[in-house]
Amino acid sequence: MYNLFEDEDDIFQGSPKSKFLDIVYNANRDLVHNELERLMTRMAAMELMLEEIHGEDKVERVIQSVQFDRADEVDMMAKNLYIISVGNVLTQNE
């Protein structure tokens, strides 16, 4: 990929993941708790949808297959989700 989010000359320095971790470790605990709760609830809903479509015993295999076959897309989506989560915490912190 183009490393769109990891420009070394970026004034914010760091990847979306590193910024997310900075926020998790340093922001208001309640705000971080709320965001992590939101993420877990979404992940649980997605797992349930996958179970309904593919069956409970195949969920892990389907996830691994997508991670392997669409690695670039998964990486980009993960970076976008880090950015969204950072934004959610920071906007609540104002």
Task: Name every feature range the model reports, one short phrase each.
Residues F5-D9, V74:
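Intrinsic disorder/low-complexity signal
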